[in-house]
Amino acid sequence: MIGRMVGLEPSSRSGVLEECRECRAIVMKGDGVQTPLHKGDSILGGEGACLMRYAAWTLISAVDVVYCSLETRESVSLTFNPDGQVIVVPFMFKGYNIAALPTTKFGDLKKDTKQIENVVSFLRSDICYAVWEFLVSSVQYKDDDRFERLFDERMRGYLRNISEGTSKVYMRGNKTFSELLEMVCGRMLECSGRVAGGGA
């Protein structure tokens, strides 16, 4: 089972994203990289006026979480323009096939009986952990495994409980996959509003 978040940006190569002075498109600079369909793209006839204004956005994988695997598939690091905009579009994959689109409701998933069992298992157990990986993907364990053991003890159960609760709402309601992820983020990052001593 693969859970993947995808961001909308005009390139997936490493470098710094800058704004084009001509058309205000976000262009990636560095290591000889130039954004596809931008000025100078040889596929469209070489040098010429900026073509980015006519281009569709390109999908890049921001998170590629592969379950049932010990291998890290891919890691992407980008520096975004402060004035730029990133739209996160969630997809869920099973193998090489898309299991859920942002607009997919649970009733739509039930129509495909071949993969519904795996999808339900992922939603109940791992959907919150996939979101956690997207939000906090750079946690490093240094020196020894004490922090990792503390995380396993405290956070994994917490994240699994959120996955269980939010997946039940998704499976019995009329929410889309995108709304499910918003619900997961809200539950995962919420504060109880209580402080030591019982005050509010």
From Swiss-Prot:
Superkingdom of origin: Eukaryota
Family that this chain belongs to: Belongs to the UPF0329 family.
Name by which UniProt lists this protein: UPF0329 protein ECU06_1670
Source organism per UniProt: Encephalitozoon cuniculi (strain GB-M1) (Microsporidian parasite)
